[in-house]
Amino acid sequence: MANTFLLKIITPGREVYNDQVEKVTLKSADGEFQVLANHQSLISTTIPCIAKFKDAKGNDEELFISKSLVQINNNEMVISSDAAEFEEDIDEERAERAFRRAEDRLKNSENYNRGRAEAAFFRAKQRLALKKSNR
């Protein structure tokens, strides 16, 4: 267990994950980063992405996370995210509708807030990528 650390993933509505892991890979605006046990203290943000981690039993796991705040301290990592969903929790039809709606809003951006449409498009795209990658 010396090469593991505690990962907590929380959203406003629930605790999504709380267990020991070997490593976590996330994406920030500056690129991908990986966290291992005994990482230095850090506060960072992420962009919507497919977060990857290896649990203490060696199983590879993936989940969608929306924009997040990440805090690492004393071998504990807390990801506070607007949304976090494992593949089985993603409603594919809803994600498809959100993707099409955002795509339409980007095409007609003079009628919509382009930044919000881009964010919605990217979130839906990441959810669908995770859902379809595990088929």
Curated annotation (Swiss-Prot):
<dbReference type="InterPro" id="IPR020546">
    <property type="entry name" value="ATP_synth_F1_dsu/esu_N"/>
</dbReference>
<keyword id="KW-1003">Cell membrane</keyword>
<keyword id="KW-0375">Hydrogen ion transport</keyword>
<keyword id="KW-0139">CF(1)</keyword>
<comment type="function">
    <text>Produces ATP from ADP in the presence of a proton gradient across the membrane.</text>
</comment>
<dbReference type="GO" id="GO:0005886">
    <property type="term" value="C:plasma membrane"/>
</dbReference>
<protein>
    <recommendedName>
        <fullName>ATP synthase epsilon chain</fullName>
    </recommendedName>
</protein>
<comment type="subunit">
    <text>F-type ATPases have 2 components, CF(1) - the catalytic core - and CF(0) - the membrane proton channel. CF(1) has five subunits: alpha(3), beta(3), gamma(1), delta(1), epsilon(1). CF(0) has three main subunits: a, b and c.</text>
</comment>
<comment type="similarity">
    <text>Belongs to the ATPase epsilon chain family.</text>
</comment>
<dbReference type="Pfam" id="PF02823">
    <property type="entry name" value="ATP-synt_DE_N"/>
</dbReference>
<keyword id="KW-0406">Ion transport</keyword>
<dbReference type="InterPro" id="IPR020547">
    <property type="entry name" value="ATP_synth_F1_esu_C"/>
</dbReference>
<keyword id="KW-0066">ATP synthesis</keyword>
<dbReference type="Pfam" id="PF00401">
    <property type="entry name" value="ATP-synt_DE"/>
</dbReference>
<dbReference type="InterPro" id="IPR036794">
    <property type="entry name" value="ATP_F1_dsu/esu_C_sf"/>
</dbReference>
<keyword id="KW-0813">Transport</keyword>
<dbReference type="GO" id="GO:0005524">
    <property type="term" value="F:ATP binding"/>
</dbReference>
<keyword id="KW-0472">Membrane</keyword>
<dbReference type="GO" id="GO:0046933">
    <property type="term" value="F:proton-transporting ATP synthase activity, rotational mechanism"/>
</dbReference>
<dbReference type="GO" id="GO:0045259">
    <property type="term" value="C:proton-transporting ATP synthase complex"/>
</dbReference>
<dbReference type="InterPro" id="IPR036771">
    <property type="entry name" value="ATPsynth_dsu/esu_N"/>
</dbReference>
<dbReference type="InterPro" id="IPR001469">
    <property type="entry name" value="ATP_synth_F1_dsu/esu"/>
</dbReference>
